[in-house]
């Protein structure tokens, strides 16, 4: 029987890290040296969990952060020949990683205040790229929710970044009424969905209208399904060597003004970021934190979640290209030809349609002296009948049984999607760690590599390897937070503020410690933000986690690699190699002194 001393969040996080990641039979190709390097990781933190959700979220994110830090130690050892560094993971600090967008503060006229996506300063710093007014009304916002169907099942609809196609597919008006309340709107949508059987609704939205949505399953139902069986054979990610690539073994080229070193292991690594939302941008932000130079590419013609840019655009230049224009496609090819990693998190098939799927990218670099890493991230996983579908964190949570279990844990006979962005952010860490894995493989074996990541892969692991709290721990956790009960029709916008209020009230001294936060300066915006610090703490800063450049909105930079990778803003003239000039804002993305 496990002793009470072992049943603490830090001890359980360590157990998950060792037994459920490093020794996981679904992760058979991990380097055997990781077992020894893992001994350099220590866990600390409060003995009890803080987030009133039955799933062991603190243990999950802490174990994944330990995995990422261990692989970074391994890469540094292989590339630079240095001894692994001691690293500590504070489980309370790691918990904040799952809610970091809501914790941002900003220095404004000498005062520090919470960052709000609704004030005028935010609009100046991060121009709104929500072209489809996704949350402009309750009608548009609440189409993303769980509703009951005609046959007594529950279904999670999702409006994505444009709710109109889903509303129109269901025969609902795209705008509500002026006097609408949340209750009125959820009742209106519920009445409409109660006319559909779940399977009919699933086909209507996904196959006929290509909109995100899923029947809400239990974990047992998911793993018994054809899709669950085909994807259930995958661990946290897959790294697959391109059989047609023959480039010799190689690291990335060293860069004169951003030399890679044990202290900044990924310095000089160039990453092309083709991502939106949360999971994909988390992959590239994590690589930037380790020293990589990231060029994010979006378009002035597509919508984006600007409310997340203060959190997820750190360490990235942000450029615009129109991929339906050949000259812009050539600019993207030029970026890729000088890069070592491409990350794609758009709906499966979108980038291939423009000529930038993994096969096309592998072929593009076939004649150069080194291969490339291509990361593709989706919701459902890359096998089975749902792999082509669009999806989001809430969809994956509902699909894999996370929502069903949480609702039952609160004493309900209905599913409830947990608040926070747990699955998204954790999937991002799986992706960044997989890139480290692939970089080492390329350095040892040569060639190009595809990395497959999905939110379902993470959630499968959460269900099978991490699990929920035992009855005693869950009862104590639930009651310590005044037993908060949410319903299936409660949206994220409703639950998140209530959850944060409870955390500040009951866990403030544990979670929101000053040492977990730091000032980050964006030279591009001439603004200082207070953000959650990097989670892994390497002893004596042997490995320094920070950002080379500050956050910003979309379209600020030219779509070209600058001659000086320390440039804060990339201008068109950088293509001619003008390099650094006075006032370019070196290193402004670092934690401010």
From Swiss-Prot:
Pathway noted in the entry: Secondary metabolite biosynthesis
One Gene Ontology molecular-function label: acyltransferase activity
Tagged with keyword Transferase: yes
The positions making up the signal sequence are none
Where does the record place the region Disordered?
572-593
Q: What InterPro entries does the record point to? A: CoA-trans_III_biosynth/detox (IPR052985), CoA-Trfase_fam_III (IPR003673), CoA-Trfase_III_dom_1_sf (IPR023606)
Q: What is its EC number?
A: 2.-.-.-
Origin species, per record, is Hypoxylon pulicicidum
Broad EC category: transferase
Q: What is this protein called?
A: Acetyl-coenzyme A transferase nodX
Q: What does this protein do?
A: Acetyl-coenzyme A transferase; part of the gene cluster that mediates the biosynthesis of the indole diterpenes nodulisporic acids (NA). Nodulisporic acid A (NAA) and its chemically modified derivatives are of particular significance because of their highly potent insecticidal activity against blood-feeding arthropods and lack of observable adverse effects on mammals, in particular the tremogenicity associated with the paspaline-derived IDTs is not observed.
Keywords of this entry: Acyltransferase, Transferase
Pfam families with a match to the protein in the record: CoA_transf_3
Q: Which family does it belong to?
A: Belongs to the CoA-transferase III family.
Compositional bias segments (type: Gly residues)? 580-593
Keyword Transferase annotated: yes
């Amino acid at each position: 029987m496990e002793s009470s001393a072992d049943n603490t969040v830090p001890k359980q996080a360590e157990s998950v890290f060792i037994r459920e990641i490093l020794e996981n039979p679904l992760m058979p190709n991990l380097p055997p040296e990781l077992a020894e390097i893992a001994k350099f990781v220590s866990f600390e933190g409060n003995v009890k969990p803080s987030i009133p959700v039955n799933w062991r979220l603190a243990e999950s994110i802490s174990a994944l952060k330990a995995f990422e830090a261990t692989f970074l130690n391994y890469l540094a050892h292989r590339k630079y020949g240095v001894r692994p560094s001691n690293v500590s993971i504070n489980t309370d600090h790691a918990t904040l990683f799952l809610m970091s967008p809501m914790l941002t503060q900003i220095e404004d006229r000498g005062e520090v205040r919470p960052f709000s996506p609704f004030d005028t300063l935010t609009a100046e710093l991060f121009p709104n790229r929500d072209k489809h007014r996704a949350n402009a009304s309750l009608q548009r916002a609440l189409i993303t929710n769980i509703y009951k169907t005609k046959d007594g099942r529950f279904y999670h609809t999702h409006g994505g970044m444009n709710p109109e196609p889903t509303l129109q597919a269901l025969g609902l008006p795209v705008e509500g009424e002026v006097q609408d309340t949340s209750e009125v709107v959820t009742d209106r949508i519920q009445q409409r969905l109660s006319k559909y059987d779940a399977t009919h609704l699933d086909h209507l939205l996904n196959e006929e209208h290509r909109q995100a949505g899923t029947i809400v399953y239990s974990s047992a139902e998911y793993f018994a399904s054809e899709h669950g069986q085909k994807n259930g054979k995958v661990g946290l990610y897959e790294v697959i060597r391109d059989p047609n690539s023959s480039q010799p073994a190689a690291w990335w080229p060293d860069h004169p003004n951003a030399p890679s070193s044990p202290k900044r292991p990924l310095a000089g690594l160039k990453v092309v970021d083709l991502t939106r939302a949360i999971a994909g941008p988390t992959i590239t932000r994590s690589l930037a934190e380790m020293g990589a130079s990231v060029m994010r590419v979006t378009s002035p013609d597509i919508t984006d979640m600007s409310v997340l840019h203060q959190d997820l655009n750190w360490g990235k230049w942000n450029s615009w290209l129109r991929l339906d224009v050949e000259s812009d496609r050539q600019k993207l090819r030029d970026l890729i030809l000088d890069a070592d990693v491409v990350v794609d998190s758009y709906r499966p098939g979108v980038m291939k349609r423009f000529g930038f799927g993994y096969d096309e990218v592998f072929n593009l670099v076939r004649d150069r002296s080194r291969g490339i890493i291509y990361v593709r991230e989706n919701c459902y996983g890359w096998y089975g009948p749902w792999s082509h579908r669009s999806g989001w964190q809430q969809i994956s949570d509902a699909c894999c049984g996370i929502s069903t279990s949480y609702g039952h844990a609160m004493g309900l006979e209905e599913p409830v999607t947990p608040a926070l962005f747990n699955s998204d952010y954790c999937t991002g860490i799986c992706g960044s760690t997989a890139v480290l894995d692939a970089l080492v493989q390329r350095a040892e074996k040569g060639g190009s590599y595809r990395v497959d990541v999905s939110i379902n892969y993470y959630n499968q692991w959460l269900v099978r390897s991490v699990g929920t709290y035992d009855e005693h721990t869950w009862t104590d956790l639930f009651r310590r937070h005044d037993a908060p009960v949410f319903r299936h029709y409660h949206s994220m916008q409703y639950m998140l503020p209530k959850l944060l209020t409870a955390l500040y009230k009951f866990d403030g001294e544990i979670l929101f410690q000053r040492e977990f936060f730091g000032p980050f300066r964006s030279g591009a915006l001439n603004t200082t933000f207070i953000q959650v610090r990097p989670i892994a703490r390497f002893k004596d800063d042997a490995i320094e986690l920070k950002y080379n450049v500050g956050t910003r909105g979309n379209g600020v930079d030219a779509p070209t690699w600058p001659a000086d990778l320390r440039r804060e803003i990339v201008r068109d003239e950088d293509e001619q190699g003008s390099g650094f000039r006075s006032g370019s804002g070196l290193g402004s993305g670092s934690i401010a002194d």
